[in-house]
Amino acid sequence: MTEKQVFKTTWGGRPLEVEIGQLAKQANGAVLVRYGDTVVLSAAVASKEAKDVDFFPLTVNYEEKMYAVGKIPGGFIKREGRPSERATLTARLIDRPIRPMFSEGFRNEVQITNIVMSVEQDCTPEMAAMFGSSLALAISDIPFDGPIAGVDVGRINGEYVLNPTVEQAEQTDIELTVAGTKEAINMVESGAKEVSEEDMLGALLFGFDAIKELVAFQEEIVAAVGKPKMDVDLLQVDADLKKEIFDAYYNTMKTAVMTEEKLAREVEIDKVKDTVKEVYAEKFSEHEEEAQLLKEVKQIAEDLEKDVVRELITIDKIRPDGRKLDEIRHLSSEVSILPRVHGSGLFTRGQTQALSVCTLAPLGEHQIIDGLGVQDSKRFIHHYNFPQFSVGSTGRAGSPGRREIGHGALGERALAQIIPSEEDFPYTIRLVAEVLESNGSSSQASICAGTLALMDAGVPIKAPVAGIAMGLVSDGENYTILTDIQGLEDHLGDMDFKVAGTKDGITALQMDIKIQGITEQILTEALDQAKKARMEILEELTTTIAAPREELSQYAPKIEMIQIKPAKIKDVIGKGGETINSIIDETGVKIDIDQDGNVSIASSDAEMIKKAIKIIEELTKEVEVGQVYLAKVVRIEKFGAFVNLIKGKDGLIHISQLANERVNNVEDVVKLGDEVLVKVTEIDKQGRVNVSRKALLNEENKEK
């Protein structure tokens, strides 16, 4: 039995402990990460043989176990089901910095599983899982060029904070996750409250310093317990064969690549590849290693396209569609595309097009987020759909995949910063982005279309937001940064760096790369170039619609907010919801009440809203000493009569307060059902109300 080994350090001021050798020993590599009281088991496994595929088959899973926070899953079967949106996003977050750290041509299937077993809310399980995933690979026999590490960075009052607590996260104006190796950053995910490029770069470098410490800690562990790496067969091609094909077809491929229109370009490129494969299929038809050689020919044909595109950009400074390196494709935008929806915006950038639709609903329609974190809700929701027809293909349709969930979340982060507060705009807001055409940067097109749809719907956003995707082609020593990358440049380039923001600053950032890291200089230049492009796109958006519409759509619900005392909530709701349901039945409105007494009344009929407000005001009206009421007698007792002052509140007229003269029998003065004028004379400590008819009679006599 392998002896358990424990390694300790601190991370963001909290203890970080790694256990190896006791759990999951049949995996190629496994570690138990303890970060404070957060515990994550990370295990990495690789197939023994390479798969016959033209991509690296890596899968990262992040499994949230409800027992980690002392909960039993809801629903009938009482067990965890499909991953939550947060789990899906976390799996993507871990995958992105790890994927570039495998050798090109490695085709063994690799699966990394992270099981969240215990959660302390202030010690993020996501970052513990990223750390564990890297370390499980690093100590295993799986070929891996890591380790990598990731950290969360916030900023409070101008000071950067490492791995903010739940309380600190509510105060921060930057929410950044950054990952990398000890040499360079290779993944970024961020939301921010309109911060400058300089401040965002500062946050990245602050996080990078912490990353280097975590990587050094992993290297110590690998030196102590790491396994020798397995020998694997990487797909390699014959150098002479590659030179022969490149010499024969380079110029033909260059002509094909420079076809301006996307679909036509794809046809021309495929023609060249097919020609290469056909010629060499015939040439090698009698060769004893025909299958292997044809596999190499297929790879060389792909390499030919890649090299042509990259050399065009880095050497000739020409892009496949003829644009300059910092040139944005043709822009166009429209609003009010759909007649019955609450708001819509269409944004087109070259051959990428997104239609965004805004729907407004009462606050009660907000989304509840119930997972391993603190239970929360959100009233702004952004969804992204990518149908296959957008790229001229057939394919799977149905529930969103990881990519769609990730792009939707990026758009939500970018736009959430400019959504008005609940007090200023008491609506739940849902944006749905339908990608209708795609040739790169569709997530950023959805952000631009979302801005248009919000303004068309009359949402009083703080400022318009635009997004742009930056690219990179690097040969190690030299690099070229591209503005507004199209699909081919994304596919064959080294970086996809998405930047969204207003004219005043960045609201969202996402970076993925295919190389093992990028420098501070590249980050700085990419951010500066992105800012220039963002301003150009914002000008297009505000030319189409300069400001949010002053009136909501006639089809949007009208919402009024009123405030009642929290103690009065029970009076509005009534026993078993009887009172509130009667108001809803009578008026047809939708009513939402929070624990602070904020009442939202929604309906398409403004008159019914007014009626509901009047009823609620009557229900919650306070009885005050000195007020006069026309009250109805509801009960007779020997000592006096009980009268109803307002709905839900009765008062007592003591027999001595019925008249100026002595009264022996209450019913000599009032009878059940009578209406009498009374004045409130006292409200005792128990809330009981005493009223007097006699006091009003005396006042009348004085006036006479």
Curated annotation (Swiss-Prot):
SUPFAM superfamilies: Eukaryotic type KH-domain (KH-domain type I), Nucleic acid-binding proteins, Polynucleotide phosphorylase/guanosine pentaphosphate synthase (PNPase/GPSI), domain 3, Ribonuclease PH domain 2-like, Ribosomal protein S5 domain 2-like. Keywords: Cytoplasm, Magnesium, Metal-binding, Nucleotidyltransferase, RNA-binding, Transferase. SMART domains: KH, S1. Gene3D superfamilies: GHMP Kinase, N-terminal domain, K Homology domain, type 1, Nucleic acid-binding proteins. It holds the Pfam family S1. One of its GO terms (biological process) is RNA processing. One of its GO terms (molecular function) is 3'-5'-RNA exonuclease activity. Its cofactor is Mg(2+). Its main location: cytoplasm. It is found in: Cytoplasm. Residues 557-616 form the KH domain. It is an enzyme of class 2 (transferase). Residues 626-694 form the S1 motif domain. It catalyses: RNA(n+1) + phosphate = RNA(n) + a ribonucleoside 5'-diphosphate. GO terms for cellular component: cytosol. Mg(2+) binds at residues 490, 496. Involved in mRNA degradation. Catalyzes the phosphorolysis of single-stranded polyribonucleotides processively in the 3'- to 5'-direction. This is Polyribonucleotide nucleotidyltransferase.
